[in-house]
From Swiss-Prot:
May be involved in modulation of pathogen defense and leaf cell death. Activity seems to be regulated by Ca(2+)-dependent calmodulin binding and seems not to require heterotrimeric G proteins. The modification Phosphoserine is found at residue 512. The C-terminus contains a calmodulin-binding domain, which binds calmodulin in a calcium-dependent fashion. It comes from Arabidopsis thaliana (Mouse-ear cress). Residues 473-490, 498-513 have a biased composition (Polar residues). GO terms for biological process: defense response to fungus; negative regulation of defense response; response to fungus. Residues 522-548 have a biased composition (Basic and acidic residues). The gene is MLO2. The chain crosses the membrane at residues 16-36, 62-82, 165-185, 288-308, 318-338, 372-392, 416-436. This is MLO-like protein 2. It comes from the Eukaryota. Residues 462-573 are annotated as: Disordered. Residues 1-15, 83-164, 309-317, 393-415 are extracellular.
């Protein structure tokens, strides 16, 4: 009979067939590995450290998939040999009993086999289906050991094989989906470049002259947000809900939030020198590393989604709408935060001087954590990717008409809602998130570019080693006079917030122009986006001082007194 036909082993297989399969698998694997390595090299060459770290996360996900694949392959036979009763196995199926009987030739649950009532055609169909499944299974002997005991396998060998494919499809679709969303969001944010360049024009500086006094409601930012609907919570959320669909990020909002960020974190006079758009791009690249990763919490959510595919739960009516509802709430919340920033301006007074200054703060965000919004966006992207991956996998395995898609409406709902969520994430929520989350109480480490950040980390690491080994003196003499400490060019003291407010008495008289006259005013803020040529000029200038007057040049580094002073500066990820 057909169900007694067993698959051939390697002893019965041609060696050339085995060699061809191994060659193809190795060739594809080597090409993929080499491609990933080339992409990583390109990211390093372009100084895209955040994207390189995101690529490392993708490689970690691929390694995790390799472990899952190995475990499924090894545990396929032991798992399929676990037997459970037919009563337990008949619960929570994707198909109804009638659908299973029609599709697989199984009798309805609860009916006993009387031997005469079963139609010969149905019996033949059952035998054909079972033999087909056994032929396609991996590492099976072609028969079900549990059937001999009158029981059912916990998960059949072929079922594990199908699950194996789905997990791989889910991971790949999630990564691709995140990349597409990030790319579309970057395209949407290209318009910000012209806004950023406008801040360096004379017209912008004149219109925002600090000597000008205006009513808060008469400013462009005030006219957009200070209205009657912003006085009550209900009308505020309703208006912000619809506002996200029509110009979620406007020029007025961008310029106001940019000005507030710079005034909160930098010394006055640096507004035209700081590139806020590039800072947002670096922050978004770093957040992309988190989004592209499938964390244990996200894997747990995937398991819950698999559980909801039981017949009777009708998951197709509510599961696709979860990411849609969440992303709409997140977008509304981000719009509400912008409006509340405007209301804070009015609370300080009806008259503003120059450009309106918004006051950032973590209290504007849920639970006082701006990163919580990133988690919700991560959850939305994964949920939507899960819907797409599950649809593609189930269609490939069981055709379009299957138990997971009970009707055409199910397919339409999944695809339409998935497309809507994709558009909202890319063109509405992601640009809003990138801008509004900068309004927290603290600025992110990405305020420095990769070159400056690397110098800061090296300086901090060297300073910690000096303190740890007790190589500094207890006086105010700076430790930088020692040859192993960072030089003037790598000292980050002039990068720190409120540096201009520190007492100049801690720094003895120095020939450096930074602490005298016009030079001090000009270099009070080291522009992270300065050109490489300027950095080289500064480096050569400091080397000249070190060669001629090493003692005086070393005075420009901050002193290290105790380990507590080191904790005042940290560069954590």
């Amino acid at each position: 009979m057909a169900d007694q036909v067993k698959e051939r082993t390697l002893e019965e297989t041609s060696t050339w067939a085995v060699a061809v399969v191994c060659f193809v698998l190795l060739f594809i694997s080597i090409v993929l590995e080499h491609s990933i390595h080339k992409i990583g090299t390109w990211f390093k060459k372009k100084h895209k450290q955040a994207l390189f770290e995101a690529l490392e996360k993708v490689k970690a996900e691929l390694m995790l998939l390799g472990f899952i694949s190995l475990l499924l392959t090894i545990g396929q036979t032991p798992i399929s040999n676990i037997c459970i009763s037919q009563k337990v196995a008949s619960t929570m199926h994707p198909c109804s009993a009638a659908e299973e009987a029609k599709k697989y030739g199984k009798k309805d649950a609860g009916k006993k086999d009387d031997g005469d009532g079963d139609k010969p055609g149905r019996r033949l169909l059952l035998e054909l289906a079972e033999s087909y499944i056994h032929r396609r299974s991996l590492a099976t002997k072609g028969y079900d050991k549990c059937a001999e005991k009158g029981k059912v396998a916990f998960v059949s060998a072929y079922g594990i094989h199908q699950l194996h494919i789905f997990i791989f499809v889910l991971a790949v679709v999630h990564v691709v989906y995140c990349i597409v969303t990030y790319a579309f969001g970057k395209i949407k944010m290209r318009t910000w470049k012209s806004w950023e360049e406008e801040t360096k024009t004379i017209e912008y500086q004149y219109s925002n002259d600090p000597e000008r006094f205006r009513f808060a409601r008469d400013t462009s930012f005030g006219r957009r947000h200070l209205n009657f609907w912003s006085k009550t919570r209900v009308t505020l959320w309703i208006v912000c809900f619809f506002r996200q669909f029509f110009g979620s990020v406007t020029k007025v909002d961008y310029l106001a939030l940019r000005h507030g960020f710079i005034m909160a974190h930098f010394a006055p006079g640096n507004e035209s020198r700081f590139d806020f758009r590039k800072y947002i791009q670096r922050s978004l690249e770093k957040d992309f590393k988190t989004v592209v990763e499938i964390s244990p919490v996200i894997w747990f959510v995937a398991v819950l989604f698999l559980l909801t595919n039981s017949y009777g739960l009708r998951s197709y009516l509510w599961l696709p709408f979860i990411p849609l509802v969440v992303i709409l709430i997140v977008g509304t919340k981000l719009e509400v935060i912008i409006t509340k920033l405007g209301l804070r301006i009015q609370e300080k007074g009806d008259v503003v001087r120059g450009a309106p200054v918004v006051q950032p703060g973590d209290d504007l965000f849920w639970f006082g954590k701006p990163r919580f919004i990133l988690f919700l966006i991560h959850l939305v992207l994964f949920t939507n990717a899960f819907q797409l991956a599950f649809f593609a996998w189930s269609t490939y395995e069981f055709n379009l008409n299957n138990c997971f898609h009970e009707s055409t409406a199910d397919v339409v709902i999944r695809l339409v809602v998935g497309a809507v969520v994709q558009i909202l994430c890319s063109y509405v929520t992601l640009p809003l998130y990138a801008l509004v989350t900068q309004m927290g109480s603290k600025m992110k480490p990405t305020v420095f570019n990769d070159r400056v950040a690397t110098a800061l980390k090296k300086w901090h690491h060297t300073a910690k080693n000096e303190t740890k080994h007790g190589r500094h003196s207890g006086s105010n003499t700076p430790f930088s006079s020692r040859p192993t400490t960072p030089t003037h060019g790598s000292s980050p003291i002039h990068l720190l917030h409120n540096f201009n407010n520190r007492s100049v008495e801690n720094y003895p008289s120095s020939p450096s122009p930074r602490y005298s006259g016009h030079g001090h005013h000009e270099h009070q803020f080291w522009d992270p986006e300065s050109q490489h040529q300027e950095a080289e000029t500064s480096t050569h200038h400091s080397l000249a001082h070190e060669s001629s007057e090493p003692v005086l040049a070393s005075v420009e580094l901050p002193p290290i007194r105790t380990s507590k002073s080191l904790r005042d500066f940290s560069f954590k990820k």
